[in-house]
């Protein structure tokens, strides 16, 4: 199994069990998330509750919770939304921090294509949810989520160059 860690913080953000599609010349990865239900285990013990006069589960408090699989698996932490000025400030700092961590070939490609990806994200800014890794480090990479027109499950966007592949 491959795990993808944030190159800036070491937080685990994704794994190969979630297929991705490269967009914007490979700068962004698009990953489909899914809402899943946690808890609410229905255990059949073979009894016949209607014959025993128990129409309800007495003393059972299942606490079923709906969560997004990617957010839950990698313990992503949601952040307040950014306005345009905050986002541009974040991107400048992110580019400054990430660029020296890339090899020369990747630096060239990153510098050439990050502007288009930034414009794409700015065009969706009001629809985005913002997440960071478990450490909630200020200098970490952001993970973005949005809902495509009519979709019930979120689509996540990752900065591909900010991910380090680690074999588990």
UniProtKB/Swiss-Prot annotation:
Chief location: cytoplasm
Protein name per the record: Translationally-controlled tumor protein homolog
Species annotation: Hevea brasiliensis
Entry similarity comment: Belongs to the TCTP family.
Gene3D superfamilies to which the protein is assigned, alphabetical: Metal Binding Protein, Guanine Nucleotide Exchange Factor, Chain A
Gene label: TCTP
Entry keywords, A to Z: Calcium, Cytoplasm
InterPro entries, alphabetized: Mss4-like_sf, Mss4/transl-control_tumour, TCTP, Translation_control_tumour_CS, Translational_control_tumour_p
Primary role: Involved in calcium binding and microtubule stabilization.
Domain TCTP, first and last residues per copy: 1-168
């Amino acid at each position: 199994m491959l795990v993808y860690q944030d190159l800036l913080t070491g937080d685990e953000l994704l794994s190969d069990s979630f297929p991705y599609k490269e967009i914007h010349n490979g700068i962004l990865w698009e990953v489909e998330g899914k809402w899943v239900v946690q808890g609410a285990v229905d255990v059949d013990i073979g009894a016949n509750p209607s014959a025993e006069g128990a129409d309800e589960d007495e003393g059972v408090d299942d606490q079923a919770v709906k969560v997004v699989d990617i957010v839950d698996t990698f313990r992503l932490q949601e952040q307040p939304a950014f306005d345009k000025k905050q986002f541009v400030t974040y991107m400048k700092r992110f580019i400054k921090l990430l660029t020296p961590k890339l090899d020369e070939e990747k630096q060239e490609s990153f510098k050439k294509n990050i502007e288009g990806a930034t414009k794409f994200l700015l065009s969706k800014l009001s629809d985005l949810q913002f997440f960071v890794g478990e450490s909630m480090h200020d200098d970490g990479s952001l993970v973005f989520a949005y809902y495509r027109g009519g979709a019930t499950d979120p689509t996540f966007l990752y900065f591909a160059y900010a991910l380090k592949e680690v074999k588990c």
